[in-house]
Amino acid sequence: MNPSHPQPKIQLNQSEDYREIYSNSVQVRVSVWDFLLVFGLVHQETPEQVNVNNALGVYLSPQQAKALWNILGQNLAQYEQTFGALALEPQPPKGPVH
């Protein structure tokens, strides 16, 4: 840390429209200028019908998308070190998805 340029203090505030949601679905859309992450919930109504209800879209610059990728990777590595490896199924499980 350079004493002539001290780090600024960061204060985190929540805006009035801040909200938290649960998501079991994310769609990623990419353009030259940005990434769009669309979070939603998957509901399987019948064996033939799966509905995805999109709840929130977040636009990120390519730089912020890469920073998110890095921090998620670090946190997933710590999670797996603590709780064990996460396995991703190549195919969705058969039967209803809740």
Residue ranges and their predicted role:
Residues M1-Q63, N70-H98:
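N-terminal intrinsically disordered, cationic/polar leader segments
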